[in-house]
């Protein structure tokens, strides 16, 4: 009898234990870790704890939560990656978990052009992306092309005078108004862009006859040609190997992106010409936008404002921090004392690309 009673008690305990395990599992969301820690990203320890979304602050996803997939070509420890994380954090907190941002970084969803093609093709596989402002030029964002003109911004303050203006809002909405299927949420910047090479350089004359990587962008093509070099289109994801094998001799990127993508390993020379301030914007497809309620749309807009301000607060400090790390690691950094020859070399590019947009160009120039 005692043995039978003991057997019953043990069976009951086992059943209760299995039941307890069954109800506890769903409390841990499965999607969040994959979205926040792409396989190719840099170790989480590289991003200061105060600058990354804290896990304990994340909103618990609602049962009927809308998940928006967000693409980022760079790692999360870059200026743009950190800005993306801030946007994700703000959206999820402000929506109480009714909107989840599935952030996929380090180019796992493709290059900027790949991502844009996917977004414009519909289907909802990618809903949001952080892109270079000029990337929309071929997709109904002609005004945004002005933001990548060489030396249009004389300082960061000049850029932010534009980015916080009514004119910026007009630029953000242009693609949607032209029927391209995407709209801008907010602007930011990733620092001034500089050329870097696999060979030793001294000044502007060091580029003559060299192959310099460009994206499929007419302004960058013109800029490189103005330096006497040969523009060579290479996908961003293939740039490291292209530099390593000599397919190209150099390229250009903001300082933080140059380091995070390990380009110093194959191109350890950088000249600080600052030809363009890397204006960025975060865009969303009209398809994704239209499935949100007006309240949820407002949440994205307000979260974008916070992320934009955050971007402004970290950009210069992060850039200087990385620049010092590059110098300490042995990268050859060449200062440019006189920018005049560079400005003269790119005048034809500016004159050609402001045709029909002269008034907008002048408005931006006057904001400095």
What would you call each of these model-derived segments?
Residues 1-67:
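Short, low-complexity disordered leader/linker segments with a strong preference
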Residues 22-29, 58-157, 167, 177-368:
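N-terminal secretory/targeting leader peptides
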Residues 160:
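N-terminal glycine-rich phosphate/adenylate-binding segment common to multiple enzyme folds
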